[in-house]
């Protein structure tokens, strides 16, 4: 082995003894993921005495391919899982996939169509076998992609919603709810997809605003020369009209209530009824009523005992109830009906109208309200407890703003249509008796009718809504309905990380089912993350061409850079605006850490970290500062993760790593590391080792691969087989010096001030200069005395004078750093006249840029035609040029003051 190690992994540690010059993510990621899995580091021990932390993955569809939503969701979950594992918890991250009924059936049906076949050719059993075959061959793609993301799920426990154990749980829940009268069968209006030939819940219907028409139709009143005008966006449904409604207080139609309309094209009389649903101020104040094809009309139809006439078949084709329009597809029927009404002089007006059209969430076919016999869950009693659980804090929803959305839906919840007319899914465990027509619902397949004892039974052909089995996910995956050790240890789960788009589909239903069947909430926290959009805040879509593929990004920039980017932009309640440039920026961060680690390792070759006790060391001011800052960063990172503020954790770690550790401490340590004082060098090595080793632990949940690679390359024995098994932080054992840290930061402010002046005045960076520090207090002078060596070294100063009321040099550029004024004598350093000429020349150039971009961005034609990305880039260029111009002018003013 390249390292000695206190633990004995199954294989040699898969790494070189030293870090190569460049970081190659692909090779590093593959070897460490294999190492973690082969050594069982993701596995949750249900018999462990450690406190549990459990989280269930929102199971991706078995048809799925990793997209940005998956990437964000699973990165955040993995950060939590790795952090809690390192923080001493027994972590179960439960993985699995969803059978995705309609989606998977569509995929396999397309395959069959390409082969010139169909599911009907195979028959139900043959088709289901074919889907299982597809799942075996292709269904694991999304899981392999999650592994590339670094997901530390317990893959030994991977579940599938059609697994035998989960299927048993589904049947138990269905039968129990049926026995309690909460599941029932009813003939009512549902959302119907004419393409998928199945019912859809309200949540499975996506509404899109579409430009269409509002047609005003004339309906003759029987026995008079009057007519009523009704407006509709779906004129074909008039074939099923069974009434015209007016408001009971509408005086215009008071004398017509109770009379009849002669329904055009159908020669059928329908009544004029009064109902308060009608808005008498909208349109003519008269509304056509089609109870079998409109949800509002359905309720009116029930109130007035109207006839329900279904005019379509399951494919959206007009049936025998449509008279002469029988056999026409619904939109063909619309065209024909409008033409015939127009010919009869009954089409009064056509106006443009923006309409919210409901579409199937899977195939995007326009849905049809359709009368059908379906299975339902009465969710009202279940919802009451789920509402109470959030109200009383048993479950927290984070950010809290989503609680309002949750309550609004739950307080207005409607019964859940759970039956689907497809073949792939959990078949409803109900059997119909040929003898008595009664239904038998059973945990086991029955051999006889539970009502009359007859043996000729036919099982329900419908399957359950995919979300029915998903609603049981937190406890069915742990072995329910059996009382398992896993359930005892890990239920209720600690948190759920999910997108807001499935708050109702999934989260609310898990709440209801968990409380019903486990007597406890399924999770203590629900963290709802935002959407990943493009750099301009636009939703990613193939049609816009702005989709960023996670796997392409991982291949190009590495998983760690990608993960850190997602975390850095995952602010609560704010969508992630993602661009490839930002990911490239965080790749630079990974490289910065890599290069700093290479520097450290080169200076730790002769160092043995065993027995480090920094309390016994004579620490410099810089060392006390970096250790104190490390203690604070560890606390801030842990607090941010505890509060699901992933962006704050990333920000704290980024700033400390890049600026404080790499830019400052490494530079501050070089004199000691390169010096002749052996004791001083040993202490400097001990601090460098400690800070880097602890920093890698803090970074690991966000950047698991590069941190493992570097951590394993550190000298000495490792305290664990992997960094992911090490403690998240042991900084509580480190010495801290608050006053010393404060003094060091004042010294650093002075160094930054000197550097700023050098930059503004164009003093060559390598040129050693003189400086004067006018201290306003004796305490400030004491601090400067303590930091004299640092200031001279890092600010490249040969002659440094400081004190209270110190003599001020002539022709000096100045800057204030707190209670210290920095003065840099410029005489002999630069030619003031030449510098003034240079600045004027640069100002003229930048002013041209500002003028050019200003004109461009005030051009209405350009603004109207240019893509959003181009506009954004030009606006940024203008802002950068204006900022540069301001800095140059300030520099010129300072020069003028010196002359």
Swiss-Prot record:
Which superkingdom?
Bacteria
Membrane-spanning segments? none
Q: What is its EC number?
A: 6.1.1.9
Motif 'KMSKS' region per record, residues: 539-543
Residues that hold ATP according to the record: 542
Alphabetized Pfam families for the sequence: Anticodon_1, tRNA-synt_1, Val_tRNA-synt_C
Q: Which reaction does it catalyse?
A: tRNA(Val) + L-valine + ATP = L-valyl-tRNA(Val) + AMP + diphosphate
**Where does this chain mainly localize?**
cytoplasm
What GO molecular function annotation could you give as one example from this UniProt entry?
ATP binding
Q: Name one GO biological process term.
A: valyl-tRNA aminoacylation
Coiled-coil stretches noted in the UniProt entry, renumbered to this chain: 827-898
Where does the motif 'HIGH' region lie?
Answer: 60-70
A GO CC term attached to the entry: cytosol
Alphabetical UniProt keywords:
Aminoacyl-tRNA synthetase, ATP-binding, Coiled coil, Cytoplasm, Ligase, Nucleotide-binding, Protein biosynthesis
The record's listing under CDD domains reads: Anticodon_Ia_Val, ValRS_core
The cellular location(s) given in this protein's UniProt record come to:
Cytoplasm
What does the record's free text say on domains? ValRS has two distinct active sites: one for aminoacylation and one for editing. The misactivated threonine is translocated from the active site to the editing site. The C-terminal coiled-coil domain is crucial for aminoacylation activity.
Oligomer and partners: Monomer.
Q: What does this protein do?
A: Catalyzes the attachment of valine to tRNA(Val). As ValRS can inadvertently accommodate and process structurally similar amino acids such as threonine, to avoid such errors, it has a 'posttransfer' editing activity that hydrolyzes mischarged Thr-tRNA(Val) in a tRNA-dependent manner.
Q: Which family does it belong to?
A: Belongs to the class-I aminoacyl-tRNA synthetase family. ValS type 1 subfamily.
- Can you name this protein? Valine--tRNA ligase
């Amino acid at each position: 082995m390249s390292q000695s190690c206190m633990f004995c992994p199954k294989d040699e540690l898969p790494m070189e003894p030293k870090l190569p010059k460049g970081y190659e993510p692909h090779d590093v990621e593959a070897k460490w993921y294999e190492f973690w899995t082969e050594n069982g580091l993701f596995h949750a021990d249900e018999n462990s005495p450690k406190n549990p932390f459990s989280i269930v993955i929102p199971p991706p569809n078995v048809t799925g391919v990793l997209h940005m939503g998956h990437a964000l969701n699973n990165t955040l979950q993995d950060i939590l899982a790795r952090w809690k594992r390192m923080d001493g918890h027994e972590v179960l991250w439960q993985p699995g996939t969803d059978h995705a009924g309609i989606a998977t059936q569509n995929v396999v049906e397309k395959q069959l169509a390409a082969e010139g076949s169909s599911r009907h050719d195979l028959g139900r059993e043959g088709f289901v076998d074919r889907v299982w075959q597809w799942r075996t061959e292709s269904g694991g793609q999304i899981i392999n992609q999650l592994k590339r993301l670094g997901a530390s799920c317990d893959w030994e426990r991977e579940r599938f919603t059609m697994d035998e154990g989960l299927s048993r749980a589904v049947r138990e829940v269905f039968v129990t709810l049926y026995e309690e009268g909460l599941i029932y069968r009813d003939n009512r209006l549902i959302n119907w997809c004419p393409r998928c030939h199945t019912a859809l819940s309200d949540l499975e219907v996506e509404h899109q605003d579409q430009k269409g028409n509002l047609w005003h139709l004339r309906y003759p009143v029987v026995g008079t020369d009057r007519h009523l005008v009704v407006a509709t966006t779906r004129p074909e449904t008039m074939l099923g009209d069974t009434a015209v409604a007016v408001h009971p207080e509408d005086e215009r139609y008071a004398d017509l209530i109770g009379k009849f309309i002669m329904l055009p094209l159908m020669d059928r009389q329908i009544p004029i009824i009064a109902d308060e649903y009608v808005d008498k101020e909208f349109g003519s104040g008269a509304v056509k009523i089609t109870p079998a094809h409109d949800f509002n009309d359905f309720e009116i139809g029930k109130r007035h005992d109207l006839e329900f006439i279904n005019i379509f078949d399951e494919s959206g084709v007009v049936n025998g109830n449509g008279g002469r329009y029988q056999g026409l597809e619904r939109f063909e029927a619309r065209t024909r009906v409008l033409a015939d009404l127009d010919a009869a002089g009954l089409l009064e007006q056509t106006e443009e109208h923006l309409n919210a059209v409901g579409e199937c969430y899977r195939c995007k076919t326009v849905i049809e309200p359709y009368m059908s016999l379906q299975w339902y869950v009465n969710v009202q009693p279940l919802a009451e407890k789920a509402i109470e659980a959030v109200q009383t804090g048993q479950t927290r929803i984070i950010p809290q703003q989503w609680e309002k959305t949750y309550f609004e839906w739950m307080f207005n919840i409607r019964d859940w249509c759970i039956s689907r007319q497809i073949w792939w899914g959990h078949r409803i465990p109900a059997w119909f008796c040929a003898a008595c027509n009664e239904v038998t619902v059973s945990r086991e397949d029955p051999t006889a009718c539970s009502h009359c004892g007859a043996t000729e039974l036919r099982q329900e052909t419908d399957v359950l809504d995919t979300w029915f089995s998903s609603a049981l996910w937190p406890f069915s995956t742990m072995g329910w309905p059996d009382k398992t050790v896993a359930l005892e240890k890990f239920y209720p789960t600690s948190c759920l990380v999910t997108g807001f788009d499935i708050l109702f589909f999934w989260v609310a239903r898990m709440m209801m089912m968990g409380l019903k069947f486990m007597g406890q909430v399924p999770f203590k926290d629900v963290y709802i993350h935002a959407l990943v959009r493009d750099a301009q805040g636009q939703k990613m879509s193939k049609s816009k061409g702005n989709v960023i593929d996670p796997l392409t990004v991982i291949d190009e920039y590495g998983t760690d850079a990608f993960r850190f980017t997602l975390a850095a932009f995952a602010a609560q309640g704010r969508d992630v605006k993602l661009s490839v440039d930002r990911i490239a920026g965080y790749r630079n961060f990974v490289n910065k850490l890599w290069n700093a680690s290479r520097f450290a390792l080169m200076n730790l070759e002769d160092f043995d970290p065993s027995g480090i006790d920094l309390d016994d060391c004579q620490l410099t001011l810089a060392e006390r500062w970096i250790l104190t800052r490390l203690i604070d960063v560890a606390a801030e990172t842990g607090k941010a993760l505890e509060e699901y503020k992933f962006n704050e954790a990333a920000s704290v770690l980024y700033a400390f790593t890049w600026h404080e550790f790499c830019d400052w401490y490494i530079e501050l340590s070089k004199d000691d590391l390169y010096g002749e004082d052996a004791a001083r060098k040993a202490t400097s090595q001990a601090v460098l080792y400690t800070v880097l080793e602890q920093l890698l632990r803090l970074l690991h949940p966000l950047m698991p691969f590069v941190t493992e690679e570097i951590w394993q390359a550190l000298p000495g024995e490792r305290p664990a087989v992997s960094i992911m098994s090490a403690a998240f932080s042991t900084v509580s054992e480190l010495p801290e010096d608050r006053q010393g840290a404060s003094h060091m930061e004042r010294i650093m402010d002075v160094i930054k001030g000197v550097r700023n002046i050098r930059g503004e005045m164009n003093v060559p960076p390598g040129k050693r200069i003189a400086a004067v520090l006018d201290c306003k207090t004796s305490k400030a002078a004491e601090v400067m005395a303590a930091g004299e060596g640092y200031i001279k070294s890092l600010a490249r100063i040969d002659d440094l004078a400081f004190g209270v009321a110190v003599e001020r040099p002539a022709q000096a550029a100045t800057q204030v750093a707190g209670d210290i004024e920095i003065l840099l004598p410029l005489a002999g350093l630069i030619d003031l006249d030449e510098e003034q000429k240079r600045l004027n020349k640069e100002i003229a150039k930048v002013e041209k840029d500002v003028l050019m971009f200003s004109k461009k961005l005030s051009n209405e034609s350009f603004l109207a035609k240019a893509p959003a990305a181009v506009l954004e880039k030009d606006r940024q260029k203008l802002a950068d040029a204006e900022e540069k111009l301001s800095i140059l002018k300030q520099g010129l003013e300072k020069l003028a003051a010196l002359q």
